[in-house]
Structure formats: C-alpha cells, structure tokens
Amino acid sequence: MEFEEIRPYHDEELPQVFEELIADPAFQQVACAVMPGVPFEAIAQKMRASKTKQEFQENLCYGILHKLAKDTTDGLILESMAVLNKQSAYTYVSNHRDIILDSGFLSVLLVEQGLDTVEIAIGDNLLIYPWIKKLVRINKCFTVQRALTMRQMLESSIRMSRYMHYTIAEKKQSIWIAQREGRAKDSNDVTQDSVLKMLAMGGDGDIITNLQELNIVPLSISYEYDPCDYLKAQEFQLKRDIPDYKKTTDDDLLNMQTGLLGYKGRVCFRMASCINEDLDELERTLPKPELFVA
C-alpha cells in the first residue's frame, strides 16, 4: 500500500504493538517516570484494555496531558474565531514551539470542544528509538521523512500530501502540521514555501482547489515562557558559528524532556477560521511562486 511507510497503526495492529512496548525496558522506565506512583502493571493493563487508538488516548494520554498542563503551565486556553463543523476534518497549520506538546495540548483543547484528536505530522529524525516510533504511531502520528536526496524528497512530499488529502477526505480525520521544518530558534514564525507546495501536491485540481480540499485552519501557539529557550539559543549560535553543526540524538531527547517538564507560564492557542473563502479570492491564473506568496 502507498502509505505503509508513513501511516499510523491500524487499530487491529495495536495488541501486538502493546505487547512489544510492555516488554521493552526503555519504555517501562519512561512510562513510570511520566506517571510516578503508578505501578507499571496498571499502565500495561490500561494499554491492553484499549482496543483503538482513540481508547488508548482516552485511557492514558489525556490524563497525562492534563497533568502536564496543571504542573507546568498557569493555564491552557483556546481563543477561536473559527466555527468548525464537527462533521468535517481540518488541517491545523501552526507555528512550532514544542516537539510534543504543540499537538498534544491542541488535542486536549479540541476534545474539550467536542471534537476529535488530530493526526500529527512528525519528523522521522525524532523517532530515535524503536519504542518512540511505536508510541507515536499509536498516537495517530504519520511520518515526515527527512535526510533524503532531492529526488527522494520530491517523491516523499508527494506521498505525504496524498496521504493528508486521503486522511481529510476519506478518513474524515483532522491533522496537525507545523508551518515549517523544526522550531523557529529566533521566534520568527514564517511559513515555509516548501510546506505550502507539499500541501498542494496531493489533489487532482489546481493549486487553490488542492489547498481548499485540506480545509486549512491557521493556528498560533504562544507560551509565556519557553522552557527550551536556552537550548534553542544554544543551537542557533552553534549553527551560526559551525557551518556543519548537527544536533545529536541526546540533544533531541533533552529538548523533548525539557519541553515536556519545564515551566511554561500561560499557554494560549489562537485559532483562525478556515481559509477556503480567502483562497477563493486569489487569482487562480497567477504563476505558482506568486500564489504561494499570496
């Protein structure tokens, strides 16, 4: 199947994956650290009782995210201009502040509005260990493939765009994706042209029609305090001073841990309306470069 390499798990695959995770000492250690005081046997029991990805999120993830919001923020709020149809699926495109919690907190806020959690675009550079790759696929993540040749990157972008169009149109499942590759180290949140071009690759119409099929909803995420600010500043400086600098696996793990557990102050998600009507106002005959800038 076209999407086998990048898709989340199907529900019928979960029992085997749960057993593999339960038997993994590294996963056991992380699970007990995230849920202190809860015996791992109780965690394993909740996993085995989950028959779907949705049930897994309800039984385990929702409570963890609520606790993280309580312990590490001074409040989590959603300000919305959008009137969302609960029968429709949307593509939430946001700035990127935290590797895990951007999409995690968004899902909590959507559930509180009576909406479904989102499928999440995640870079394969973050899938450092087998247990991480399994866990994110349980949590409705699909993979953005990195470190490819130019030709492979084009093929990967087309496949991912087709998957996103399929997910919105056929699965009726909303999606979250960041507006750029990686977090903005200088907080200059500019949407990358390459992301917009990728989104438009998957449909059968023109650029405007293809983008409209995704029901794009712009989203802004604000943390009063960024627990990873010093790590971002350090990386920004290293990239400036060392042209071939690359983050290590340990760097990624430290960023994930610090982002999860660090103090954030007030956290606000601001949601605009779906941009389909705005796209209708654009001149479809404009050259591609001008369309993406518009």
How would you name each of these model-derived features?
Residues A49-E55, Y129, A147-M150, R284-F292:
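Intrinsic-disorder/low-complexity, polar/charged segments
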Residues I77-Q173, R180:
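Glycine- and small hydrophobic-enriched segments that form the cores of compact globular domains
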Residues F27-F40, C61, L84, D116-N125, ...:
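Short N-terminal helix-initiation segments at or just after the protein's N-terminus
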Residues P15-P25, N59-H66, Y90-T91, G114-D124, ...:
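Short, mixed-charge, low-aromatic patches
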Residues D74, D116, R137, Q212, ...:
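Residue-level signal for beta-strand positions within conserved beta-sheet cores that form or flank
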Residues R48-K51, Y62-L65, Y92-S94, G114-D116, ...:
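N-terminal start-of-chain detector that recognizes signal peptides
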Residues E2-H10, M153-A294:
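Non-catalytic C-terminal accessory region of glycerolipid acyltransferases
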